Amino acid sequence: MNYLILISFALLVITGVESARDAYIAKPHNCVYECFDAFSSYCNGVCTKNGAKSGYCQILGTYGNGCWCIVLPDNVPIRIPGKCHR
């Protein structure tokens, strides 16, 4: 009986948890949203529109100048290693 309660509680916790991550938000074809001004609100707008807490322009980052989002939901595509196919 105790195992049934423990398993039920674990399933409740697992299904109710949504995770998020910090990453470069990706356009279709695995390309980053490019930015050129670190003080512009462009990236923050792109990120928050897609459900992130905030965002900023990462200058000279891994994929060049791109929008970096903080606490981006899992259902939003992020830039992954590999080529950008424009």
Curated annotation (Swiss-Prot):
GO process annotations (BP): defense response
Signal peptide: 1-19
GO CC term, one of those recorded: extracellular region
Keywords associated with the record: Disulfide bond, Ion channel impairing toxin, Neurotoxin, Secreted, Signal, Toxin, Voltage-gated sodium channel impairing toxin
Family of the protein in this entry: Belongs to the long (4 C-C) scorpion toxin superfamily. Sodium channel inhibitor family. Alpha subfamily.
Domain LCN-type CS-alpha/beta: 21-85
A molecular function (GO) term: sodium channel inhibitor activity
Domain free text: Has the structural arrangement of an alpha-helix connected to antiparallel beta-sheets by disulfide bonds (CS-alpha/beta).
Role according to the record: Alpha toxins bind voltage-independently at site-3 of sodium channels (Nav) and inhibit the inactivation of the activated channels, thereby blocking neuronal transmission. This toxin inhibits inactivation of drosophila DmNav1 (EC(50)=130 nM).
CDD domains (UniProt xref): neurotoxins_LC_scorpion
Name this protein carries in UniProt: Sodium channel neurotoxin MeuNaTxalpha-4
Major subcellular site: secreted
UniProt entry tagged with the keyword Disulfide bond: yes
